[in-house]
Amino acid sequence: MIQQETNLEVADNSGARRVMCIKVLGGSKRKYASVGDIIVVSIKEAIPRGKVKKGDVMKAVVVRTAKDIRRADGSVIRFDRNAAVLINNQGEPIGTRIFGPVTRELRAKNHMKIVSLAPEVL
């Protein structure tokens, strides 16, 4: 459950390390984002010579949340930290690598490029 002002880790090699959610996309009154949802983020911490710099405003896909993800078979998945992958306006990831596991829910929401780059899909 990601909302405005939530801090997230960045799970790719775009150069950003930490981002903050400034808007959840998908409706004017939408408050929360879950895995697979697109949010607007501000980059709070970045490495030198990365593809992005501190202060940039980008879109991102949420790939891991500390809040439970419930599945139809009754199983539950949760992660230690919230994480996102930065994307461009066409929905393609900015980085060329994804760090850490991602969930199957990304496949259902048509983020196939992120799923294919991820080392593990839960």
Curated annotation (Swiss-Prot):
Organism: Parvibaculum lavamentivorans (strain DS-1 / DSM 13023 / NCIMB 13966)
Keyword Ribonucleoprotein among UniProt keywords: yes
One term of GO molecular function: large ribosomal subunit rRNA binding
Subunit and partners: Part of the 50S ribosomal subunit. Forms a cluster with proteins L3 and L19. In the 70S ribosome, L14 and L19 interact and together make contacts with the 16S rRNA in bridges B5 and B8.
Protein name, as recorded: Large ribosomal subunit protein uL14
PROSITE patterns: RIBOSOMAL_L14
NCBIfam families the UniProt entry points to: rplN_bact
Record gene name: rplN
One Gene Ontology cellular component: cytosolic large ribosomal subunit
